[in-house]
Amino acid sequence: MITTTTKKKAAKKRALRSPANKAYAFKSGLALKTWRQGKGIPRPLFAQIADCSERTLATYEGKARLPVKFSRPVEESIRLILALEELAGDNAALKEWLQKPNAAFDRRTPLSLIKGGEVDVLWGMVHQIRQGAFA
């Protein structure tokens, strides 16, 4: 007999495997490291985006399982990277854009916005571009 709890667990596993979540639902540090390196994102840059030290990121990338307290910032960072990459076109353009002063952000760099806790400004820009607000 299948219980409600079993059904909920199965549904949760399916959701984590769905294409929408597959890109950023990492459970292990090695999977995160492999993804980050595959995207060509240096550890110092990803650490800045995830708002952690480079040493902390290196430690967690060596773990078999990511700690819960670290999973959320990682998932949020990966979602932001994927959204910005979609708009920038490729990894090289994104890395350059993150470090270049932008008139839309009062000559601040997008990376400085991330460091300053103003990720919502970047998400607002992503939303506006996706909706065609600048067309």
Briefly describe each language-model feature range.
Residues M1-A135:
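Non-transmembrane "mature" sequence context
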